[in-house]
Amino acid sequence: MKLIKAIIRPNKLEEVKDALTRLSISGMTVSEVRGHGRQKGHKAIYRGTEYSVTLLPKIMIELVLPDEVVDETIKTIIETARTGEIGDGRVFVLPIDHGYNIRTGERDMV
């Protein structure tokens, strides 16, 4: 099992969710996050005053999946979320040993 963490642009969330649904992936956690990489923020003007926005809004999608669907899932996320511009996001893959169902206390197999 793997934990996939995809950090994407907020305006790409619905497209990515739809693409994952077409892969029959239904379980996911979606969080609003802030951060920056190479993009390093931007300048904004509010009521005539310029200020720096250094932490940009992003969406983080987390999925726990069997190993055999990880590569196709990553490919789908990248193809769907990509605009070709700096700030498109990142995908991280981490190993998962096991999980537990909180309601039943049973050890889960994804």
Regions found by a protein language model. Give the residues of each.
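Positively charged, small/polar-rich N-terminal and surface patches that mediate targeting and assembly
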Residues: 1-110
